[in-house]
Swiss-Prot record:
Belongs to the type-II 3-dehydroquinase family. Is involved in the catabolism of quinate. Allows the utilization of quinate as carbon source via the beta-ketoadipate pathway. The active site is at 24 (proton acceptor), 104 (proton donor). The gene is DQD1. Substrate binds at residues 78, 84, 91, 105-106, 115. This is Catabolic 3-dehydroquinase. Its EC number is 4.2.1.10. It catalyses: 3-dehydroquinate = 3-dehydroshikimate + H2O. It comes from the Eukaryota. InterPro entries: DHquinase_II (IPR001874), DHquinase_II_CS (IPR018509), DHquinase_II_sf (IPR036441). One of its GO terms (biological process) is quinate catabolic process. It comes from Scheffersomyces stipitis (strain ATCC 58785 / CBS 6054 / NBRC 10063 / NRRL Y-11545) (Yeast).
Amino acid sequence: MVKKVLLINGPNLNLLGTREPEKYGTTSLKDIEQAAQNQATAKQDGSEVLVYQNNTEGFIIDRIHLAKQEGVGFIIINAGAYTHTSVGIRDALLGTAIPFIEVHITNVHQREPFRHQSYLSDKAVAVICGLGVYGYTASVEYALNY
C-alpha cells in the first residue's frame, strides 16, 4: 500500500470557493487539501498526503520531479487548464513512472470542446471527473490503497 501521496492542483485552483461557484462549488482548496490530509491521518498507518498548488507549468513539472526523490508512491493531479495543453506535465509524470489519477471537479466532457482533450488520461490509472470535490476524496481513498 502507498504511504505517501502527492496531491497537485494547477492553475486557478487556488481560487476554489470563490471562482464560478455554480460550476466548482464553494469549498476552498485549503479545505480540500485539509480533508485529503485528514483521510491519510485517519488510516493511522503513517500514510500522508503532501499538497501542492501552482499556476505555473514549469513549477508543477519541477514538483513532479521532486516527488520521485521524496519517495512519493502515487500522484493525484488536477492540472486544470494544463490538462488540455501540457505535453511537459505529461512527460514529467511518465518520466517519474509514479502512478497517477487525473481528477477534475466538473465533467469536462460536458463543457467546451477544447476541454474534451486530455494529455494525461491515456496514461492515468484512472480519471475522475464530474463528482465535484468528492472526486478528491475518492482519489485519495484509491491512492492510499493502491
